């Protein structure tokens, strides 16, 4: 196959023919030189254009250069303002931090187990304070609260949580009574009792707690007098007494001896407040400060009455000089009583009736027997049982 024989490409040949470097033509060299020349020219043009751009950019005024061109006076003023602001900020910063710390105290969220433990502790603390107040006299209770004022707040925190579970709050019942009876004229049948001359309704809340009764009554009469005609407006005053001044409405006092003159009140309220072992002294004080035909309103927990209905309690208050009006026992948790202080003419009529029936001596002996019994055993142990919660 001579036609396909190519020099250097024969399979049979032992040597392979390679291209020789020296055999390159001068044309190839010229082409390479031209290409290199073009590259150098393009690089030079690029470098020149970049240099021009740099010069143009440098000629444009920057923010720093503009700031340098501002007059020195304005710059000095701005510097002074900035330094004064910094000083004020530095001085006010710690004060603001203190305020924030006071206004926003860090509160750690308790776990469910910790919440249960806290509830048990507060409950046991409330029960202990409650037992103390029911089993000591009023002067001892006043001394205790003066020495440890935090006990008053702890007790009322626990008491508030207890009453919230009740179907009805006795304070609300008393406020509703005042609202309802206020619609009738003062001293009229079914109306509220007022002082004889001024017809002012004067209420004494004995053992007021946080004086919620005074707050609600004041708000009611304020709104009532705004809408009422001039001749229908009501004059009123509320005195609130307890062992600690929890707010401005309260006067600190032992409620067996309050700073009020004789016959200066028309309604005296004991709302779950007959707590001391000497609570009949509170009743005597109520009789002293009540005006004739003034009313005594009492609400007490049902479990305190040994007979379940409070008949023995009513009889004891009759011996103290009060006339019984009505007992309200429809509530599951507490019983309400209404008494009034008879005027002198009714007392005289009653005395004459008892003499005709030859029972006056019997009544006097019953009073003496009651006082003798009180001297031996405090009425807080037999007439009204202390409200002591079961230990768990």
UniProtKB/Swiss-Prot annotation:
Top EC category: transferase
InterPro entries to which the protein is assigned, alphabetical: RRP8, RRP8_N, SAM-dependent_MTases_sf
GO molecular function per UniProt: rRNA (adenine) methyltransferase activity; rRNA (adenine-N1-)-methyltransferase activity
Chain positions covered by the region annotation Disordered: 1-96
UniProt entry tagged with the keyword Methyltransferase: yes
Compositionally biased spans, kind Basic residues: 27-38
Basic and acidic residues bias (residue ranges): 39-57, 69-92
Single GO BP term: rRNA methylation
Signal peptide: none
Gene3D superfamilies hit by this protein: Ribosomal RNA-processing protein 8, N-terminal domain, Vaccinia Virus protein VP39
Modified residues (Phosphoserine): 62
E.C. designation(s): 2.1.1.287
Keyword set, alphabetical order: Chromosome, Coiled coil, Methyltransferase, Nucleus, Phosphoprotein, rRNA processing, S-adenosyl-L-methionine, Telomere, Transferase
Pfam families: Methyltransf_8
A GO term from the CC aspect: 90S preribosome
Effect upon mutating residue 209 to A/R: Impaired methyltransferase activity and ribosomal 60S subunit biogenesis. Does not affect pre-rRNA cleavage at site A2 activity
Location of the protein in the cell: Nucleus, Nucleolus; Chromosome, Telomere
Record family assignment: Belongs to the methyltransferase superfamily. RRP8 family.
Described function: S-adenosyl-L-methionine-dependent methyltransferase that specifically methylates the N(1) position of adenine 645 in 25S rRNA. Required both for ribosomal 40S and 60S subunits biogenesis. Required for efficient pre-rRNA cleavage at site A2. Also involved in telomere length regulation and maintenance.
Note: Present with 2780 molecules/cell in log phase SD medium.
Protein's name according to its UniProt entry: 25S rRNA (adenine(645)-N(1))-methyltransferase
